[in-house]
Swiss-Prot record:
GO terms for molecular function: DNA binding. It comes from the Bacteria. Coiled coil: none annotated. It is found in: Cytoplasm, Nucleoid. It comes from Bordetella parapertussis (strain 12822 / ATCC BAA-587 / NCTC 13253). Residues 99-108 have a biased composition (Pro residues). This is Nucleoid-associated protein BPP1222. InterPro entries: YbaB-like_sf, YbaB/EbfC.
Length: 108
């Protein structure tokens, strides 16, 4: 490989790294909401999987503990799926054109 090509490749890699960092920082700010029980339990988290809020409708507080635990878990899992889908969408623009192996997800 010629010296000029190598320098260009290094610049491209550095730019990609900067874009990846910006995208990851943006994901830390994006919030998604998962819900269960028809919206009676809601979990809000960032796309970096930091839970920001858990909201439980007061009508559930006197209910069966096991059911409430199941609804919280379901709402959390719903939020997690939404966060992952949003992250993949955002990272797709950063990784567009990169020859990544099938099934490889970024960020690592």
């Amino acid at each position: 490989m010629m010296k000029g090509q190598l320098a260009g490749l290094m610049r491209q890699a550095q730019q990609m790294q900067e874009n990846m960092k910006k995208a990851q920082d943006a994901l830390a700010e994006i919030q998604v909401e998962g819900a269960a029980g028809g919206g009676l339990v809601k979990v809000t988290m960032t796309c970096r999987h930091d839970v920001k809020r858990v909201a439980i409708d007061p009508s559930l507080l006197g209910e069966d503990k096991d059911m409430l635990e199941d609804l919280v878990a379901a709402a959390f899992n719903d939020a997690l799926r939404k966060a992952e889908a949003t992250s993949q969408e955002k990272m797709a623009s950063v990784t567009a054109g990169m020859p990544l192996p099938p099934g490889m997800k970024l960020p690592f």
